[in-house]
Amino acid sequence: MANLKAIRDRIKTIKDTRKITEAMRLVAAAKVRRAQEQVMASRPFADRLAQVLYSLQTRLRFEDVDLPLLAKRPVKTVALLVVTGDRGLCGGYNTNVIRRAKERLQELEAEGLKYTLVIVGRKAAQYFQRRDYPIDAVYSGLEQIPSASEAGQIASELLSLFLSETVDRVELIYTKFVSLISSKPVVQTLLPLDPQGLETADDEIFRLTTRGSHLEVNREKVTSTLPALPSDMIFEQDPLQILDALLPLYLNNQLLRALQEAAASELAARMTAMNNASDNAQALIGTLTLSYNKARQAAITQEILEVVAGAEALR
């Protein structure tokens, strides 16, 4: 009977744990939806900004552009912006980003370049601080769905490092959202910007949908609904001055989008991890229930045998 009680207690513990993992999965799923809504809300501004920049590029393509954010100089020091999460329970999300960051730092060392780190997320901060890596700034405790103001604070730090020539290039490592079960740490150069190579944000968005009792992500192409800018648009100010004013906005927008993708990747990883944990808990409950029933049946059989044996002894 003691064995039966132990199995019952373990089944109860696993059921309680499964309730927690299922709740965390549902919360992560809801936040993925919110992340999608925020991406869509910021799209009109991003599209229009890209259109204006393209128009300015066209006008300035035959001119020598001398702007601080476009200045390319010999690279001696690189600032690496590493984006991870503040919490765990999200599978290999944080580990994969940190591993890619270490690989990139080794590549920079092999090229004879110095580096400094700007870190977003407590997990990366804890890892690199314990190992005495050079760190310029740490940002933690950000909203799970990043805001433009938070992206602006980080962009200001990066601009300060670049414009003061403390660093000659700024690179970003974040996790690109692919699907609920797939994400990819990528490296992207943020500074210096290239007026001939500005790219609009990826015209692919993700939508969280349900099919049966399962959640899935569908990526789909989205075209801008904004009217195109006229090719003969007249600017009151010098196009070069306008470009100089818009480039920081473009940097902020690129950084915000990367933070949003990273947040969606973390939430999807957490949702997948909690879903797997719930499935494993359910399978374990089934196995333990079967063991409990077998043990109970064996105990009942043993009691019957003892009763029969006792009856036979009394004859």
UniProtKB/Swiss-Prot annotation:
Membrane topology classification: Peripheral membrane protein
Primary localisation category: membrane
Compartments (UniProt record): Cellular thylakoid membrane
Originating organism: Thermosynechococcus vestitus (strain NIES-2133 / IAM M-273 / BP-1)
Keyword Thylakoid recorded: yes
Residues spanning the membrane: none
InterPro entries: ATP_synth_F1_ATPase_gsu, ATP_synth_F1_gsu, ATP_synth_F1_gsu_CS
Family affiliation: Belongs to the ATPase gamma chain family.
Function: Produces ATP from ADP in the presence of a proton gradient across the membrane. The gamma chain is believed to be important in regulating ATPase activity and the flow of protons through the CF(0) complex. The complex from the organism is particularly stable to disruption and remains functional after 6 hrs at 55 degrees Celsius.
SUPFAM superfamilies listed in its UniProt record: ATP synthase (F1-ATPase), gamma subunit (SSF52943)
Protein name per its UniProtKB record: ATP synthase gamma chain
Thylakoid among keywords: yes
Assembly, per entry: F-type ATPases have 2 components, CF(1) - the catalytic core - and CF(0) - the membrane proton channel. CF(1) has five subunits: alpha(3), beta(3), gamma(1), delta(1), epsilon(1). CF(0) has four main subunits: a(1), b(1), b'(1) and c(9-12).
